[in-house]
Design a protein with these regions (language model features):
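A ubiquitous short alpha-helical element
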Residues: 5-10, 29-36, 53, 410, ...
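Metallocofactor- and cofactor-centric catalytic cores in central/energy metabolism, strongly enriched
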Residues: 271-275, 279, 516-517, 711-717
């Protein structure tokens, strides 16, 4: 059995330390107040049994709480007082030096919490450690100085989650849609160097990757680009190649048809080269965040401005999917699934029906998804229904990174605008805690819910105020050179924070457990569903109320909870104990999702969750868990057709693994060993994570650096929907 120290390091449970701590308190009380040896042993053994029953590594603080409770149960109140006083004195000492232990533990790779915090960061790498060191300082400043103490305490208690506190000390925003079109067409500046409009497709791709890296180093969230913005440069290259061919074949008896054939062949090679640049640059670049850029590539045919551009865009999309299907080579030279870029493919009338013009691209996308987990799918049809601007027009556009969606916006010229906009940040409410705090009383639930929402509102205002007054100079690539704006040097970014240009997100998590506790049923049950929808509606109403009062675009957001699921679960267990079906797991359910272990088919799940996506305008994604579908692409195509007609944004989860020890490329299994969940090759028994390639959908993005115990349990509990 293991425990987690305050520094984050994971060590073996040692009952002798509990006994020694009790005896220290026992030694300074009078004889009449002392505990007997049998009582001390009983307390220590009870704590050990409690820790064993939790099926996870307990923290030192949780164990000390158990010791206090045990001393109280023995009616040794004077001993308890001494024990509590000692804890308090030690906590005061720690406050005088708030970050040293955590920083030292992560440098020495002893910090298990950090190791499993982000499934796309490797904390043993020096550059990642530097980011984590800066993050510890930022979190310390945030907790002690920058943030309202009530919000800090609520964050620590798991009542809410103040996202990305490790970046809050700086004036940084969350995620965005990069205006690549503006930067490529009008030029940009990177590291003080002016970059003019590119003269070929491959150069445009190279510049795009440099922009991606610069943007990623200037923010903490994901970013998205559209292949549509690269499509015009295909024809630029076509014309350039055509001129070269004419010069090469001047005076030769070569037909125009043959010349055009040669032009298109060379053009295809350039497209291959350009797309390869994006794929390999993205997975090999290291940003100042200590990781590859969290980048999403949007593939939307109807975004093209004319038929020629659409045809050229189709060529780029085909090559992007083809290369992703192939994968990238790991250190053993084996083709594996990369985490990035995340790919999103838009389903539309031109590509979703058999016989449609670009149906072949959708079939290729389905083949890729079955092997590599991407692309994910946006339905143009449903998005047109959900995202209606003030002109009454439906809009289709990419999320910012994983799932965060902008709300519809019309600029001063009356045109809808999405690229160049961003999200200010996220604060997530723990819906399960609201329900448990109410004790199941509906009236109390709504009162507590409103109080907690206002606390989240205060936390969101803190995020907004942290950005307010920020000069454009803090990130020229974003604010001055086109990614998000063309502001003057020294000009504050304030005008971009209001009027709907940017959004700010009220996240929510654990709707399933919340509804289950309040109604006794899953929210998929017809008797419980109205309550679930009313919870969603209340968050929408509050966001609209705040938006109207402040001219800031608040919107509900289905939080992915990558590692926070474990934090929330532990906090709930500490506050309310183990409640069957509610707090008996080391995770809580993401956003509005159906519980991972619930028996439901793919089509019913997607149809059910579509109602909740509509009520989550700030961000949402649904998934279905499927077996290996590489030999059943017809079923994948059926699912894609269903997605197009029924839900705005969805993905298919499968497995893509490889054992470097024995070459096994089937599913790497999750097993339990000494109370801890491990990944194990079923063929050779390898459990060395450094020699396993495991790709799983964590929460929208693909994770490849493994997960904490809570998220790992959630992955293990997932049932198939097909």
């Amino acid at each position: 059995m293991r425990i987690i120290k305050r520094s984050g390091a994971e060590v073996d449970f040692d009952i002798s330390k509990i006994i020694a701590a009790i005896y220290k308190a026992n030694a300074v009380v009078g004889e009449d107040d002392k505990l007997k040896k049998s009582q001390v042993d009983r307390i220590a053994n009870t704590v050990e049994n409690q820790c064993m029953s939790m099926n996870r590594a307990m923290s030192v603080e949780e164990i000390q709480d158990m010791v206090e409770d045990g001393i109280m149960r023995e009616n040794a109140y004077e001993v308890a007082r001494r024990y509590i006083t000692y804890r308090y004195v030690q906590s005061i000492k720690r406050k005088n030096n708030t970050t040293d232990d955590k920083i030292l533990s992560l440098i020495e790779c002893d910090n298990e919490e950090v190791k499993q915090e982000n499934s796309n960061k490797n904390p043993t790498v020096a550059s990642v450690q530097r980011d984590y060191m800066a993050g510890e300082v930022s979190k310390d400043l945030t907790e002690r100085i920058l943030l309202d103490s009530e919000v800090v305490e609520a964050h620590k208690a798991g009542i809410l989650h103040f996202h990305d506190a490790d970046y809050f000390a700086q004036h940084m925003h969350n995620c965005d849609l990069v205006n690549l079109e503006d930067m490529l067409q009008n030029g940009t500046v990177i590291s003080g160097t002016f970059i003019e409009k590119p003269h070929s497709f491959s150069t445009a791709c190279n510049i795009a990757t440099q922009i991606i890296a610069q943007v990623a180093s200037s923010q903490y969230g994901g970013q998205s680009i559209s292949l549509t913005h690269l499509a015009p440069f295909v024809d630029v290259s076509r014309k350039k190649i055509r001129d070269e061919i004419e010069a090469e074949m001047y005076g030769l008896n070569v037909s125009n048809e043959r010349k055009e054939e040669i032009v298109e062949n060379r053009l295809r090679k350039e497209i291959t080269k350009g797309v390869q640049t994006i794929q390999y640059q993205v997975v090999t670049l290291m940003t100042t965040n200590g990781q590859a850029p969290f980048i999403t590539v949007f593939m939307y045919l109807n975004e093209a401005k004319n038929e020629q551009e659409k045809e050229d865009l189709a060529l780029i999309i085909e090559e992007m999917i083809r290369q992703r299907y192939q994968g990238v080579k790991n250190e053993s030279g084996v083709w594996v699934t990369p985490a990035f870029p995340k790919l999103i493919y838009v389903l539309e009338e031109d590509n979703v029906r058999p016989g449609s013009r670009y149906y072949h691209l959708t079939k290729l996308a389905a083949k890729c998804t079955a092997k590599r987990l991407v692309p994910d799918y946006v339905s143009e049809k449903k998005m047109f229904e959900y995202k209606i601007d003030k002109n009454g027009n439906g809009n289709c556009y990419t999320p910012m990174g994983c799932r965060s969606f902008l709300t519809p916006y019309v600029d001063e010229n009356g045109k809808s605008k999405y690229y160049g906009r961003f999200n200010q940040g996220v604060v997530t409410i723990n819906l399960v805690d609201v329900a448990l705090s109410s004790g199941g009383d509906t009236t109390k639930f709504w009162d507590i819910f409103d109080e907690r929402l206002e606390l989240c509102h205060r936390a969101l205002r803190a995020r907004h105020e942290r950005l307010k007054g920020t000069p454009s100079d803090v990130a020229p690539i974003l604010w001055q050179y086109g990614a998000l704006g063309r502001l003057k040097k020294g000009e504050p970014i304030d005008k971009l924070l209001y009027g709907g240009y940017s959004t700010i997100s009220l996240g929510y998590a654990g709707l399933y457990e919340c509804v289950k506790y309040m109604t006794g049923k899953s929210h998929t049950d017809d008797a419980a569903k109205p309550f679930a929808l009313s919870v969603m509606q209340r968050m929408n109403d509050k966001c609209n109320e705040w938006k109207k009062a402040e001219n800031i675009d608040y919107s509900p957001y289905g939080t992915p909870l990558e590692s926070t699921t474990y934090k929330f679960a532990k906090a709930l267990q500490k506050r309310f104990g183990i409640i069957e079906g509610i707090t008996d797991k080391n995770y809580i359910t993401n956003s509005y999702h159906v519980h991972v272990a619930e028996d439901i088919d793919a089509f019913t799940k997607l149809k059910f969750e579509s109602e909740f996506q509509k009520l989550s305008p700030g961000g949402a994604i649904s998934y279905v868990e499927v077996p290996n579908m590489q030999d059943n692409l017809e079923a994948v195509m059926s699912l894609l057709g269903f997605i197009y007609d029924n839900i705005m944004y969805a993905e298919l989860n499968t497995k893509s693994d490889y054992c470097q020890e024995c070459g096994y490329d089937g599913e790497i299994k999750i097993v339990k060993d000494k109370g801890k969940l491990l990944w194990k090759c079923p063929k050779c028994g390898n459990t060395d994570q450094s020699k396993l390639n495991v790709a799983r959908r964590t929460c929208g993005y693909i994770g490849t650096q493994f997960w904490n115990q809570g998220r790992t349990q959630e992955i293990a509990d997932r049932v198939l929907h097909l």
